[in-house]
Swiss-Prot record:
Signal peptide extent: none
Keyword Disulfide bond: yes
Disordered as annotated region, ranges: 1-29
Annotated disulfide bonds: C162-C166
Taxonomic superkingdom: Eukaryota
GO cellular component, one term: plasma membrane
Gene symbol of the encoding locus: PGRP-LD
Cytoplasmic side: 1-88
Protein name: Peptidoglycan-recognition protein LD
UniProt-annotated glycosylation sites, renumbered to this chain: N222
Keyword Transmembrane annotated: yes
Length: 282
């Protein structure tokens, strides 16, 4: 049995001289003078000070052991530690913001690719009229038929070609014309497309194709003897596809080559889809 559960009490039955004399030598007299009481609850009394001190030391050591054990088994996670909880919350917020920003950037990139890149993988670069032109448009003119444009007309400017200084060449073209340039788009030798009247307004090019609305696209240069360079032709094809994507051009359209001294251009474009004929302007 555990010593903490035993309480010992000593009492003297009679104050006999023999008992007193024997107790001076460390003896308690006879065995009848010793009373042992076993307390199941092990409650200490004033007659057992040593046992009370032992019990207090045992309880103290037990409480220390329990506290050390609890502290050692406490998980180091964000829920038990307020500081770590705040740090983890901050990191989760940063991670969520990064994910949202990445998703928005990806969506913007995919949208840009859809509007700028045709199906055959060639990038279409369009320079707006307000960016390259020194002149303000004097009225946008007549809007296209909302049903869609049924004709694409290709021609050339008959001017110098350009590769690096295309805005300068186009400025000279603007100054040589009375009013606006009579085209919707100009396809330059630097592989860029420059907006004139754009996708929504009729150009001032002579319309002698039964009055059908036409997208007029002019190659910058003179192509009576040789066709435009490859990147110009690819940019023109991309411009047609982009017009179809925007539903400006009808799916069943016709392609014409118009203008004087455009024989080389006609020989190149007659192999394109929807090619109809080559006509000289009146």
């Amino acid at each position: 049995m555990d010593s903490s559960h035993i309480a010992v009490r000593v009492a003297r039955r009679s104050p006999s001289p023999a008992a007193v004399s024997q107790s001076s030598y460390g003896s308690l007299g006879s065995s009848q003078d010793i009373h042992i009481r076993v307390d199941k609850e092990g409650v200490a009394s004033e007659s057992t000070p040593l046992l009370a001190a032992a019990q207090r030391s045992i309880k103290t050591s037990s409480s220390l052991t329990a506290s050390v054990s609890a502290s050692s088994t406490t998980p180091s996670n964000c829920r038990r530690n307020p500081t770590l909880h705040e740090d983890c919350f901050n990191w989760r917020s940063v991670g969520l913001l990064v994910m949202c920003a990445s998703a928005l950037a990806l969506a913007a990139y995919l949208l840009w690719r859809q509007t700028q890149t045709p199906d055959f993988g060639y990038r279409l670069s369009i320079v707006g009229h307000g960016i390259w032109s020194d002149m303000e448009l004097q009225g946008r003119g007549t809007l296209f038929d909302p049903i869609g444009v049924g004709t694409v007309i290709f021609t050339h400017t008959g001017s110098n070609e350009c590769h690096d200084d295309c805005p300068d060449v186009l400025h000279k073209l603007e100054r040589s014309h009375v009013g606006e340039l009579p085209y919707n788009f100009l396809v330059a030798g630097d592989c860029q497309v420059f907006e004139a009247q754009g996708w929504h307004y009729r150009s001032q090019y002579p319309r002698d194709l039964n009055g059908i609305d036409s997208l007029v696209m002019a190659f910058v240069g003179n192509f009576s003897g040789r066709p435009p360079i490859d990147c110009q032709l690819m940019a023109a094809q991309a411009l047609i596809l982009e017009s179809l994507k925007r539903r400006i051009l009808q799916p069943i359209y016709q392609l014409f080559v118009l203008g004087s001294y455009t024989d080389a251009l006609q020989r190149e474009l007659r192999h394109w889809p929807h090619y109809a004929s080559h006509q000289t302007s009146k």
